[in-house]
């Protein structure tokens, strides 16, 4: 009888061993595949960061969970950029969709940057730290490498018939990198990278970021908000197919040249106004990280 019981257990033991081996094999395969996907994505991101010129259009949305995107707030960005031996030159503005109301406007080139004091319609110039890798905000996701420590999952997919990668961030990284209110709690976050090719070079043509955040109001009530950030890149031309260098030159000549002051002069004016009791309002400063992202400072 004991022999029969032992024999009856053997198939079950064998089955358990087979299942364990299969699970381990799948986990190893999944880990290797994820590593390969991450390498492919980072190669495309590196190629994007090396693009010589182009433009970008970005749209940001913030709305309550379960509501329509149009029910919340939104912002539209437009950027053009050109890389040279000494660094990147770019112009980027943000505001409403038709550009009639701007919340920020920047023109940055190696060694200096200009920002628009929107209250006074006055451009302000200041020195830019040499070697600082500043990029348009609209390009930050497409040109920032992804680490395995940031992600919970990566998989390959297609969007509108184009190859793409979806990266799902892990909660620990979301919590440590979130730059919102201290009472906010990021729940989930992901980015879809849509790829394009230029000859043999694969680069990121579009990014779609989504972040779900639990927010707490002054009364202690909690709700979930959804933040979406969609950025489309145009390689080599402006949005309307024009020459990037010419567009940058024209923008500077028409908007900034002869219409800016030094930031040191602005600080002097501010000090004087403060001492005299006047109320002074200064627009967004180019020293804020919202200018763009760098290897040292991420805007997101």
Residue ranges: model-predicted function:
Residues 34-37, 111-183:
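Flexible, processing/modification-adjacent segments and terminal tails
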Residues 57-63, 91-93, 109, 126, ...:
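A structural detector for beta-sheet-dominated domains
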Residues 75-139, 212-214:
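An acidic-aromatic
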